């Protein structure tokens, strides 16, 4: 009963929103227009910087990756999903990560055409999925767009927020998909080994994606720092709490499937205030938040020499203003989905269960698991809406 009550209390804590961004549907090249609106009520992708007047000061420009082959994030890609559904042409931007020369991992909701887990059919006229590599400057071999030859979705994914748990929770489990490239990725783009072990409260992660940015004081800035297929940003955070397998009623003995973190600054610490989970607040120029367009992006662990793909970025919890300090975020842990990933990639991905020393910036005060942390009533799902450009 205690776990069930905790889930109910958290129902109003988390509103998840799509991190994918709408884009002009008839574009022949992968470019996103400015002023894009995003999904409300379910989760959104991006890396938001700290306080512009903090110590040290920060800005979205400080978080931009150089897009070079030597960047540790050269294998983090942007994705353009285009399809016609109900006679309406749609186009979206998401992020993803290269795990083998022909395979990119992203979020399942990026490839879902109707919110029920219906996979985009790329054999139909007007439908395609294109992956943009940014491992070099324009005209260099590391910058290339590759069209997908196949797409796959975790079979347990039935739509964003749809939960296998027998009660009316809104959960974000199983949100993982694989894109098969029509040709090999450029050699300039890094491939990443997938972490298959457990994670704990207090561990440091690095998040990378192509979403909207902004700062922790004023939140998302869709005018000056909109999502862009060729601008990726990175930032760090600390793992706070986790959730278990919804197909197994979030039983404590079931695998961890979701991770949660919060965007701390100016005295605002979401999980410390609401749950008593008080992990370390990172430096102003390190702490980050995700946002619209980061969906499917990378959550890495770093052991001092190599980045390992721990999971994806899939949802946010609104701050006030949205994307500011006090917001929450999270994604899926790939350790729970190794069987799916190996099957979808023909077994060519490389997994590792132990990676040596991982920086742990804060002492964990509490680890909450099996609580249905993103749980919300059915009425929350009814509020999900897609805002077009």
List where the protein language model places each region.
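A short, hydrophobic C-terminal helix/tail in secreted or cell-surface proteins
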Residues: 360-378
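Chymotrypsin/trypsin-fold serine protease catalytic domain
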Residues: 173-176, 182-287
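Bacterial N-terminal signal peptides
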Residues: 11-20
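Bacterial N-terminal signal peptides that target proteins for export
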Residues: 2-11
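C-terminal membrane-anchoring or membrane-association module
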Residues: 375-389
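Sec/Tat signal peptide C-region and signal peptidase I cleavage site
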Residues: 21-27
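C-terminal subregion of chymotrypsin/trypsin-like serine protease catalytic domains
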Residues: 28-61, 67-72, 93, 97-112, ...
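A conserved glycine-rich beta-strand in the N-terminal activation segment of trypsin-fold
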Residues: 76-78, 84-101
């Amino acid at each position: 009963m205690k776990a069930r009550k905790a889930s109910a209390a958290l129902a109003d804590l988390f509103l998840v929103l799509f991190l994918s961004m709408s884009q002009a549907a008839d574009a022949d090249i992968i470019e996103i227009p400015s002023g894009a609106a995003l999904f409300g009520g379910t989760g959104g992708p991006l890396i938001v910087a700290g306080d512009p007047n903090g110590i040290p000061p920060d800005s979205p420009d400080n978080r931009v990756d150089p897009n070079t082959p030597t960047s540790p994030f050269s294998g983090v890609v942007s994705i353009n999903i285009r399809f016609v559904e109900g006679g309406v042409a749609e186009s979206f931007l998401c992020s993803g990560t290269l795990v083998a020369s022909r395979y990119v991992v992203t979020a399942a909701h990026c490839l879902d055409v109707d919110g029920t887990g219906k996979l985009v059919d790329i054999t139909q006229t007007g439908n395609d999925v294109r992956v943009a590599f940014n491992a070099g400057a324009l005209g260099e071999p590391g910058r290339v767009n590759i069209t997908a030859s196949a797409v796959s979705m975790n079979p347990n994914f039935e739509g964003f927020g749809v939960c296998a748990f027998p009660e009316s929770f809104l959960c974000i489990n199983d949100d993982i998909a694989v894109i098969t490239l029509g040709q090999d990725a450029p050699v300039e783009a890094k491939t990443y080994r997938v972490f298959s072990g457990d994670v704990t409260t207090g561990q440091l992660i690095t998040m990378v994606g192509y979403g909207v940015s902004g700062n922790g004081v004023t939140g998302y800035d869709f005018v000056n720092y909109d999502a862009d297929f060729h601008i990726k940003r990175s930032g760090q955070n600390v793992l706070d709490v986790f959730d278990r397998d919804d197909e197994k009623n979030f039983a404590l003995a079931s695998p961890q499937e979701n991770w949660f973190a919060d965007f701390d600054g100016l005295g605002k610490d979401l999980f410390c205030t609401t749950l008593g989970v008080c992990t370390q607040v990172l430096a102003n120029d390190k702490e980050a938040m995700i946002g619209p367009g980061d969906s499917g992006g990378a959550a890495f662990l770093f052991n001092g020499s190599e980045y390992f793909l721990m999971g994806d970025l899939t949802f946010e919890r609104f701050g006030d203003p949205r994307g500011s300090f006090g917001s929450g975020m999270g994604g899926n842990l790939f350790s729970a989905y190794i069987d799916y990933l190996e099957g979808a990639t023909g077994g060519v991905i490389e997994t590792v269960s132990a990676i040596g020393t991982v920086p742990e910036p804060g002492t964990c005060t509490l680890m909450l698991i099996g609580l249905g942390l993103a749980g919300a009533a059915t009425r929350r799902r009814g509020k999900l809406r897609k805002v077009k450009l």
